[in-house]
Amino acid sequence: MSLVNGRRRTAASVVALTAALTALAALCAPAQAQDTKATSKAAEAAKPDAGTLRVCAAEQPPLSMKDGSGLENRIATTVAEAMGRKAQFVWLGKPAIYLVRDGLEKKTCDVVIGLDADDPRVLTSKPYYRSGYVFLTRADKDLDIKSWSDPRLKEVSHMVVGFGTPGEAMLKDIGRYEEDMAYLYSLVNFRAPRNQYTQIDPARMVSEVATGKAEVGVAFGPDVARYVRDSSTKLRMTPVPDDTQASDGRKMPQSFDQAMGVRKDDTALKAEIDAALEKAKPKIEAILKEEGVPVLPVSN
């Protein structure tokens, strides 16, 4: 699951953001009580069962959708079948950034799909695919951006990037964040992403590029692949080089191994998932291809 939902940040950023949001939630006791009730209901509805795989889930199209058609829903279902189980999605009712804290750690569910393979909060499975950020442009435009060092990026009308992502960091690095800031905030009705989880809808990002309101988008490939595939305006996705560096020499990783996460002491379930991932590999690859997800060789 993408950093459009808080997972493609550095690990420290994920922990820091979750801590900040937890502090903010403490000021909102009534709403927090409602969330607690919702979590309790989810736990009651999804008691552990040897024949099911309880999957922590949050609505986040196109990755996770209640009708089961999301990319991560499809992969979870395939892996559960390879385990001889049935996938049971436990819907949290919160952004996916909370799945580990409010789902996995509270034992209302047992596995989170689509985490970075080095996520320190969980015990991760073997990676089952790798993907990364892409430059998104219209295919009918002579704007085949391949690097953040391309001087044309300083000349385009607007760029659309996700908040808290490597794209936002690089937008600041090349000196055009202030130029695009009002535009980006307009895409979320001017809700500032400070002490609250605010993110631009991937479908909106694709639409902005397709309609020409933004000339370049930068997004995590799996978040936008389905919308690019289905767009009536032909679009191109070009991988952002993984050796991208900021102007001060800092490395800015752009691609990430994807894994499933279980509680740190749940070694038995991890082993079972690892075996199922190997068994389900051809089906997972077929799903990724059908969705149009740009994939790279896993790093380990």
From Swiss-Prot:
Keywords of this protein's UniProt record, alphabetized? Methanol utilization, Periplasm, Signal
Which GO biological process categories is it annotated with? methanol catabolic process
Q: Give the signal peptide range.
A: 1-25
On the tree of life, the source organism's domain of life is Bacteria
Q: Which Pfam families does the entry mention?
A: SBP_bac_3
Gene3D superfamilies reported in the protein's UniProt record: Periplasmic binding protein-like II
Q: Which PROSITE patterns match?
A: TAT
Transmembrane region positions?
none
Among InterPro entries, the record links this protein to: Methanol_oxidation_MoxJ, Solute-binding_3/MltF_N, TAT_signal
Acyltransferase as a keyword? no
Compartments reported by the entry: Periplasm
Q: Quick one: a GO cellular component term? A: periplasmic space
Coiled coil where?
Answer: none
PANTHER family assigned = ARGININE-BINDING EXTRACELLULAR PROTEIN ARTP, MEMBRANE-BOUND LYTIC MUREIN TRANSGLYCOSYLASE F
* Function as written in the Swiss-Prot or TrEMBL entry: May be involved in the assemblage of active methanol dehydrogenase and/or its cofactor PQQ in the periplasm.
Q: What is this protein called?
A: Protein MoxJ
Source organism: Methylorubrum extorquens (strain ATCC 14718 / DSM 1338 / JCM 2805 / NCIMB 9133 / AM1) (Methylobacterium extorquens)
